[in-house]
C-alpha cells in the first residue's frame, strides 16, 4: 500500500473512532503524517479493510516535556529525537484493540512505552505505561519510576508547574 492509501485508511479509522472523530484535521496532520514519514506506525488490515492503527515516537526528555505540556507540539524531527518511547495514537474502533495489543507486544517485545490516554468526551488525559512481553514486570516498574522522576524534575523547572500532593 502506498503512503496516500495508508493515509486514507488511517483517516477512515479516525472517523470511526469515538475519541478521534471530532478532533481537528490539524491534529490528524500533526499525529499521522510524521508517523508515516518516519515509518513509526502499524496499520492492521483484515480482508482489505483497515481495523486498527498505532503510531509511536521516540522522544528525548526535552521533547517529552514539550509533548506533556502540549500534545500538538511534536514536529517531524521530534519523532526520532531520543529513546523514550510514546504511543501517539492507538485506534481500534471495531473492537480489535486486543489484536493490536498482541501485535505491539510482539513487535516491541523488549520495549517500554508510555502514552497519554484520554477518554472520549474528557478534556483530561493521564499517562499510562506499557511494556513488551519479554520485559520483567518488576524491572519495567523500576524503569518507569526512573522515567517519572526525570520527567517530574524537568517539569518542575518550568515556571507554570505546580506539584500538588494528596494527604
Swiss-Prot record:
It holds the Pfam family HlyC. GO terms for biological process: toxin metabolic process. Protein-lysine myristoyltransferase that catalyzes myristoylation of the protoxin (RtxA) at two internal lysine residues, thereby converting it to the active toxin. The active site is at 20, 89. It is found in: Cytoplasm. Keywords: Acyltransferase, Cytoplasm, Transferase, Virulence. It catalyses: tetradecanoyl-[ACP] + L-lysyl-[protein] = N(6)-tetradecanoyl-L-lysyl-[protein] + holo-[ACP] + H(+). Its EC number is 2.3.1.-. GO terms for cellular component: cytoplasm. This is Protein-lysine myristoyltransferase RtxC. The keyword rRNA-binding does not apply. It comes from Kingella kingae.
Amino acid at each position: 500500500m502506498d503512503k496516500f492509501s495508508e493515509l486514507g485508511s488511517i483517516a477512515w479509522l479516525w472517523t470511526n473512532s469515538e475519541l478521534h472523530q471530532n478532533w481537528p484535521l490539524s491534529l490528524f496532520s500533526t499525529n499521522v503524517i510524521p508517523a508515516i514519514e518516519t515509518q513509526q506506525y502499524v496499520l492492521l488490515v483484515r480482508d482489505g479493510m483497515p481495523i486498527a492503527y498505532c503510531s509511536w515516537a521516540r522522544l528525548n526528555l526535552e521533547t517529552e516535556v514539550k509533548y506533556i505540556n502540549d500534545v500538538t507540539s511534536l514536529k517531524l524531527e521530534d519523532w526520532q529525537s531520543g529513546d523514550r518511547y510514546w504511543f501517539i495514537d492507538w485506534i481500534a474502533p471495531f473492537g480489535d484493540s486486543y489484536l493490536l495489543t498482541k501485535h505491539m507486544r510482539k513487535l516491541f517485545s523488549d520495549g517500554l512505552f508510555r502514552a497519554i490516554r484520554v477518554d472520549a468526551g474528557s478534556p483530561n488525559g493521564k499517562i499510562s505505561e506499557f511494556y513488551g512481553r519479554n520485559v520483567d514486570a518488576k524491572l519495567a516498574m523500576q524503569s518507569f519510576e526512573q522515567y517519572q522522576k526525570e520527567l517530574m524534575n524537568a517539569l518542575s523547572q518550568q515556571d507554570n508547574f505546580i506539584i500538588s500532593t494528596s494527604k
